[in-house]
Amino acid sequence: MPTINVNKVDLERLSNISLSDKLIEDRFPMMGVEVEEIFEEVDKNGKKQNMVQFSINPDRPDYLSVEGLARGFRGFMGITTGIQEFEVLDSDIKVTVEENETRPYVAFALVKNVLMDEFVLESMINLQEKLHWAIGRDRKKLAIGIHDFDKVKAPFTYKEIKGDEIKFVPLGYEDEEMTPREIIEKHEKGIKYAHLIQNDKFPIILDANGEVLSLPPIINGTLTKVTPTSKNLLIDITGTEKEAVEETLNIIVCALVERRGTIVSVNVNGKKYPDLTPKSRIISVESINKKLGLNLNPGEIIQALKKSGMDALYEDGNLIVKIPAYRNDILQNVDLKEEIAINYGYEKFDGKLPSVATTGSKDPVEKKCSAMSDLMIGLGFYEVMNLTLSNQDTLFEKMNLKVDEKDYIEVLKPASIEHRVLRTSILPLLLETLYINKHNALPQKIFEVGDCVVIDEEDTETDTKCKNIKKIAGAITHPLTNFNEIKSSTEALLREFFEGFEFENYEHPAFIPGRCAKILKSGKEVGFFGEIHPEVILNFELEHPVVGFEITIE
């Protein structure tokens, strides 16, 4: 889980409550935020500062700043309850968006008169980087720019340019102008994120004078560098998913309101941002009490929702709940039930001992998976962990597989277009991992042991007609890798865990013909291995030969 370090004095100031170490250690975990450490550190001026390190659940990106954390704690403690109304002032600031294939979505907002100091500046920088990871997938999905608005002139333009079309001074090179192409070749951030630039097309944000604000997702220009004396902040979010871009903007501007900032709208191609209109959901009182095992009346439930920064209206057995725009984690009614449980108080729930004594033990399949992981690490592979949710493009299209929609399970209301299908295979995600890491040194040897979900029409025990199966997959990439290398690693794994296996020639669309083998155990196919087809390698934008295997674990 991501962690944040916050200054205790700053947290007290924003929470509007005196915070003893005991209060912090007792109450924050009850609202779902773990306290890792309370410690002292010396700042750059030689003064001792009392600090607190918190672990933040990935589903609460609004807690990734001291501002959001303090806002949540005020509600949890009953200091400030109910939904907060955010005023957004109109302006004539405009952004023109020209065609942009790489990162087509963009949102802007201006927050004026922020009470800026060293604490606020550090908090904003940390929030920016944490959101890059938590929502932005290390800037692949979205990138954030925060600028000193007083140093630029509206209107602004967001477009794509070629690598040598313009020069500007990037952050970190205070007096050296560079072209975008030079930045990805020489600048530390440019080298790190060069893989996000495609076909020599560089997204760029310019002001009315042609000055560069940002080269997303790489680096901002020095011109708009934010300092402790900045007070008017222009925020830009660019990315590949519209919903994620808009939600991230909402989180940032609502955090800045905690610093007495005033939100001002920006017109982006005719649409005003930010949109802080509360969302709403309808949930029945009966379903809440059934899930929580309680007998709360509507008033008690509404009070719990108010403590979580929401509001609700009771009508005919149902609650119409208003949810603030910065809460992107409320996806289903079960999320509301969790909020009610947290703010009702987990300490109020009665614990009951089961009437039957049981003895726990490790699941045999999990035990086998752990042993397989140890063996793969011994063979020089690095273990990775991907999400079970993926998409058709990664799982099938890039692998040259023709798959009927009946052969996989699709999420009805996905939170992201990248996570709309339950994976049926692990190997495609390993190729995606190699793409993300192709800027790192070779050779690269990775593996994963995990769940895949397949349709099971013969399932009579559940209504889902699907089941989880464990698989292990591995991949190797470097200029000289070949069939023999992956055969050697696969055989080592099979000899240890699969008795009576044999190989058979296999024609698989993702592999080179004649360089792929099927793995059989007692005449039943349990896996395959071989050299990945060059077309598939190019589909994943890889640059070197790749070999791989995948085996179903019984």
Swiss-Prot record:
Alphabetized Gene3D superfamilies for the sequence: 3.30.56.10, Bira Bifunctional Protein, Domain 2, Phenylalanyl-trna Synthetase, Chain B, domain 3
Listed EC numbers: 6.1.1.20
Cofactor(s), by name: Mg(2+)
GO term, biological process aspect, one: phenylalanyl-tRNA aminoacylation
InterPro entries (alphabetical): aa-tRNA-synth_II/BPL/LPL (IPR045864), B3/B4_tRNA-bd (IPR005146), DNA-bd_dom_put_sf (IPR009061), Phe-tRNA-ligase_IIc_bsu (IPR045060), Phe-tRNA-synth_IIc_bsu_arc_euk (IPR004531), Phe-tRNA_synthase-like_B3/B4 (IPR020825), Phe_tRNA_ligase_beta2_arc (IPR022918), PheRS_beta_core (IPR041616)
Catalytic activity entry: tRNA(Phe) + L-phenylalanine + ATP = L-phenylalanyl-tRNA(Phe) + AMP + diphosphate + H(+)
Binding site for Mg(2+): 329, 335, 338-339
Pfam families: B3_4, B5, PhetRS_B1, tRNA_synthFbeta
Annotated GO CC locations: phenylalanine-tRNA ligase complex
Cellular compartment(s): Cytoplasm
Claim: Cytoplasm is one of the keywords in the record: yes
B5 domain: residues covered: 276-351
Source domain of life: Archaea
UniProt-recorded Gene Ontology molecular function terms: ATP binding; magnesium ion binding; phenylalanine-tRNA ligase activity; RNA binding
Record keyword Metal-binding present: yes
UniProt record similarity statement: Belongs to the phenylalanyl-tRNA synthetase beta subunit family. Type 2 subfamily.
Assembly: Tetramer of two alpha and two beta subunits.
Name of protein: Phenylalanine--tRNA ligase beta subunit
Name of encoding gene: pheT
